[in-house]
Protein backbone atom coordinates (compact mmCIF):
# COMPACT_ATOMS: atom_id res chain seq x y z
CA UNK A 1 0.00 0.00 0.00
CA UNK A 2 2.82 2.42 0.88
CA UNK A 3 4.51 1.83 -2.48
CA UNK A 4 1.21 2.38 -4.31
CA UNK A 5 0.60 5.56 -2.33
CA UNK A 6 4.02 7.05 -3.10
CA UNK A 7 3.95 6.13 -6.79
CA UNK A 8 0.37 7.35 -7.37
CA UNK A 9 1.25 10.59 -5.59
CA UNK A 10 4.31 11.20 -7.79
CA UNK A 11 2.54 9.92 -10.89
CA UNK A 12 -0.34 12.36 -10.43
CA UNK A 13 2.15 15.25 -10.37
CA UNK A 14 4.00 13.98 -13.45
CA UNK A 15 0.73 13.62 -15.34
CA UNK A 16 -0.83 16.95 -14.37
CA UNK A 17 2.37 19.00 -14.71
CA UNK A 18 4.04 17.06 -17.52
CA UNK A 19 4.28 20.00 -19.94
CA UNK A 20 5.90 22.54 -17.58
CA UNK A 21 8.22 19.86 -16.17
CA UNK A 22 9.52 19.05 -19.66
CA UNK A 23 9.82 22.75 -20.54
CA UNK A 24 11.78 23.39 -17.35
CA UNK A 25 14.24 20.55 -17.99
CA UNK A 26 14.57 20.53 -21.78
CA UNK A 27 12.86 23.66 -23.14
CA UNK A 28 15.80 25.44 -24.70
CA UNK A 29 17.88 25.45 -27.87
CA UNK A 30 16.58 23.21 -30.65
CA UNK A 31 14.10 21.50 -28.31
CA UNK A 32 10.97 23.05 -29.85
CA UNK A 33 7.29 22.86 -28.86
CA UNK A 34 6.73 19.73 -30.94
CA UNK A 35 9.49 17.94 -29.00
CA UNK A 36 8.00 19.23 -25.73
CA UNK A 37 4.60 17.78 -26.66
CA UNK A 38 6.08 14.36 -27.52
CA UNK A 39 8.12 14.09 -24.31
CA UNK A 40 5.17 15.37 -22.24
CA UNK A 41 3.00 12.57 -23.59
CA UNK A 42 5.71 10.05 -22.71
CA UNK A 43 5.94 11.48 -19.18
CA UNK A 44 2.16 11.11 -18.79
CA UNK A 45 2.36 7.50 -19.95
CA UNK A 46 5.22 6.75 -17.54
CA UNK A 47 3.28 8.48 -14.75
CA UNK A 48 0.40 6.09 -15.32
CA UNK A 49 2.71 3.08 -15.31
CA UNK A 50 4.89 3.95 -12.30
CA UNK A 51 2.81 2.14 -9.63
CA UNK A 52 2.77 -1.08 -11.66
CA UNK A 53 6.56 -1.04 -12.21
CA UNK A 54 7.23 -0.76 -8.49
CA UNK A 55 4.52 -3.20 -7.39
CA UNK A 56 5.80 -5.84 -9.79
CA UNK A 57 9.34 -5.54 -8.44
CA UNK A 58 8.11 -5.71 -4.85
CA UNK A 59 5.95 -8.78 -5.50
CA UNK A 60 8.85 -10.56 -7.22
CA UNK A 61 11.01 -9.91 -4.15
CA UNK A 62 8.27 -11.33 -1.91
CA UNK A 63 8.35 -14.56 -3.93
CA UNK A 64 12.14 -14.69 -3.60
CA UNK A 65 11.68 -14.16 0.14
CA UNK A 66 9.48 -17.27 0.39
CA UNK A 67 12.01 -19.18 -1.72
CA UNK A 68 9.89 -19.40 -4.87
CA UNK A 69 11.78 -18.22 -7.95
CA UNK A 70 9.82 -20.35 -10.44
CA UNK A 71 6.53 -18.44 -10.24
CA UNK A 72 7.95 -14.96 -11.04
CA UNK A 73 10.15 -16.51 -13.74
CA UNK A 74 7.17 -18.12 -15.49
CA UNK A 75 5.09 -14.96 -15.22
CA UNK A 76 8.02 -12.92 -16.58
CA UNK A 77 8.21 -15.19 -19.65
CA UNK A 78 4.47 -14.69 -20.24
CA UNK A 79 4.92 -10.92 -19.77
CA UNK A 80 7.75 -10.79 -22.33
CA UNK A 81 5.64 -12.60 -24.93
CA UNK A 82 2.66 -10.34 -24.23
CA UNK A 83 4.92 -7.29 -24.50
CA UNK A 84 6.00 -8.36 -27.99
CA UNK A 85 2.37 -8.53 -29.11
CA UNK A 86 1.21 -5.32 -27.45
CA UNK A 87 4.25 -3.38 -28.70
CA UNK A 88 3.09 -4.19 -32.21
CA UNK A 89 -0.58 -3.57 -31.35
CA UNK A 90 -0.11 -0.19 -29.64
CA UNK A 91 2.80 1.30 -31.62
CA UNK A 92 1.46 0.68 -35.12
CA UNK A 93 2.96 2.65 -37.99
CA UNK A 94 2.89 2.38 -41.76
CA UNK A 95 4.22 -0.47 -43.88
CA UNK A 96 4.11 -1.47 -47.57
CA UNK A 97 0.94 -3.40 -46.72
CA UNK A 98 -0.82 -0.55 -44.91
CA UNK A 99 -1.11 0.40 -41.25
CA UNK A 100 0.37 -2.16 -38.85
CA UNK A 101 -2.24 -1.47 -36.18
CA UNK A 102 -5.51 0.49 -36.01
CA UNK A 103 -4.32 2.25 -32.84
CA UNK A 104 -1.05 3.64 -34.25
CA UNK A 105 0.05 5.34 -31.00
CA UNK A 106 3.66 5.64 -32.03
CA UNK A 107 6.31 5.90 -29.32
CA UNK A 108 3.61 6.30 -26.64
CA UNK A 109 2.41 2.81 -27.53
CA UNK A 110 5.68 1.37 -26.25
CA UNK A 111 5.05 2.83 -22.79
CA UNK A 112 1.37 1.86 -22.72
CA UNK A 113 2.29 -1.68 -23.77
CA UNK A 114 4.80 -2.03 -20.94
CA UNK A 115 2.32 -0.51 -18.47
CA UNK A 116 -0.45 -2.92 -19.47
CA UNK A 117 1.88 -5.94 -19.28
CA UNK A 118 3.17 -4.86 -15.85
CA UNK A 119 -0.42 -4.50 -14.63
CA UNK A 120 -1.18 -8.00 -15.93
CA UNK A 121 1.97 -9.41 -14.27
CA UNK A 122 1.12 -7.68 -10.96
CA UNK A 123 -2.37 -9.19 -11.02
CA UNK A 124 -1.04 -12.70 -11.69
CA UNK A 125 1.68 -12.39 -9.04
CA UNK A 126 -0.84 -11.14 -6.48
CA UNK A 127 -3.27 -14.00 -7.08
CA UNK A 128 -0.44 -16.55 -6.97
CA UNK A 129 0.83 -15.03 -3.74
CA UNK A 130 -2.66 -15.14 -2.24
CA UNK A 131 -2.90 -18.82 -3.22
CA UNK A 132 0.45 -19.57 -1.54
CA UNK A 133 -0.09 -17.62 1.66
CA UNK A 134 -3.88 -17.98 1.83
CA UNK A 135 -4.26 -15.03 4.19
CA UNK A 136 -4.14 -11.93 1.99
CA UNK A 137 -7.13 -9.62 2.33
CA UNK A 138 -7.50 -8.90 -1.40
CA UNK A 139 -10.82 -7.06 -1.02
CA UNK A 140 -9.29 -4.60 1.45
CA UNK A 141 -6.20 -4.27 -0.74
CA UNK A 142 -8.37 -3.45 -3.77
CA UNK A 143 -10.48 -0.96 -1.79
CA UNK A 144 -7.35 0.78 -0.48
CA UNK A 145 -5.83 1.06 -3.95
CA UNK A 146 -9.06 2.41 -5.47
CA UNK A 147 -9.14 5.11 -2.78
CA UNK A 148 -5.48 5.91 -3.48
CA UNK A 149 -6.24 6.30 -7.21
CA UNK A 150 -9.18 8.60 -6.39
CA UNK A 151 -6.94 10.71 -4.15
CA UNK A 152 -4.32 10.83 -6.92
CA UNK A 153 -6.90 12.07 -9.44
CA UNK A 154 -8.12 14.82 -7.12
CA UNK A 155 -4.64 16.00 -6.12
CA UNK A 156 -3.46 15.87 -9.75
CA UNK A 157 -6.38 18.00 -10.95
CA UNK A 158 -5.74 20.46 -8.12
CA UNK A 159 -2.04 20.78 -9.01
CA UNK A 160 -2.94 21.41 -12.67
CA UNK A 161 -5.33 24.26 -11.87
CA UNK A 162 -3.10 25.71 -9.14
CA UNK A 163 -0.27 25.93 -11.67
CA UNK A 164 -2.60 27.66 -14.14
CA UNK A 165 -3.85 30.31 -11.70
CA UNK A 166 -0.39 31.28 -10.43
CA UNK A 167 0.57 34.18 -12.67
CA UNK A 168 4.25 35.03 -12.85
CA UNK A 169 6.28 36.52 -15.74
CA UNK A 170 7.90 33.75 -17.76
CA UNK A 171 11.41 32.85 -16.67
CA UNK A 172 13.25 29.72 -15.58
CA UNK A 173 13.12 30.71 -11.89
CA UNK A 174 9.42 31.62 -12.00
CA UNK A 175 8.56 28.37 -13.79
CA UNK A 176 10.49 26.41 -11.16
CA UNK A 177 8.71 28.37 -8.41
CA UNK A 178 5.28 27.63 -9.91
CA UNK A 179 6.11 23.93 -10.11
CA UNK A 180 7.31 23.83 -6.51
CA UNK A 181 4.20 25.64 -5.22
CA UNK A 182 1.66 23.62 -7.24
CA UNK A 183 3.30 20.25 -6.57
CA UNK A 184 3.78 21.12 -2.88
CA UNK A 185 0.10 22.00 -2.46
CA UNK A 186 -0.78 18.81 -4.36
CA UNK A 187 1.26 16.75 -1.87
CA UNK A 188 -0.52 18.42 1.06
CA UNK A 189 -3.93 17.73 -0.53
CA UNK A 190 -2.92 14.10 -1.17
CA UNK A 191 -1.77 13.66 2.43
CA UNK A 192 -4.93 15.22 3.91
CA UNK A 193 -7.23 13.14 1.71
CA UNK A 194 -5.27 9.99 2.59
CA UNK A 195 -5.95 10.69 6.26
CA UNK A 196 -9.64 11.45 5.64
CA UNK A 197 -10.13 8.30 3.54
CA UNK A 198 -8.16 6.23 6.06
CA UNK A 199 -5.31 4.86 3.97
CA UNK A 200 -3.72 2.31 6.32
CA UNK A 201 -0.05 3.08 5.73
CA UNK A 202 -0.55 6.82 6.19
CA UNK A 203 -2.31 6.14 9.50
CA UNK A 204 0.61 3.93 10.56
CA UNK A 205 3.13 6.64 9.64
CA UNK A 206 1.21 9.18 11.72
CA UNK A 207 1.61 6.97 14.80
CA UNK A 208 5.39 7.36 14.80
Residue ranges and their predicted role:
Residues 1-208:
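Membrane-embedded alpha-helical bundles of multi-pass transporters/translocases
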